[in-house]
Amino acid sequence: MSNGEPARVWGTAVDLSEAEKYGGHRLGQGKLQGECAAGVQWVFITAGKPLGLTKTWKQGKKVRGGNIRPGTAIASFRNGKYQQDHAAIFIEETEKGLLVWDQFNTPRKAWGKRLLPFSAGQKDHSNNGNLFYTIEK
């Protein structure tokens, strides 16, 4: 920045190796095992960087075009609040969408990589890469 202050780092990140080591597993405990947010929280807790409860998450910087650091916790937000739609760990942005580590229960998908496509006009907050932001605590 021109005023001599350090650039703002958006979101909380872990090394991607922390996410990779759980590939193929359903993360979380009890009734939350397999839920998307539980997977993200699990990786961050085991890396020593807990994200806190989802009700405390705040919307940060838009991921698409945001030059986000790999390993950053991201989620879809509505009106600045996390509404339990979807959370993931950012890997990279491609022309087609956001490559992430995630999991979900319906349909059942273990922790793994997938693409959240940039879907113009689609309001599916769980699958549209245009609707994701960094998670701020």
Spans of model-derived segments:
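Secreted/periplasmic proteins that engage bacterial cell-wall peptidoglycan
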Residues: 1-86, 92
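Aromatic- and glycine-rich peptidoglycan recognition patches
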Residues: 6-10, 24-27, 91-137
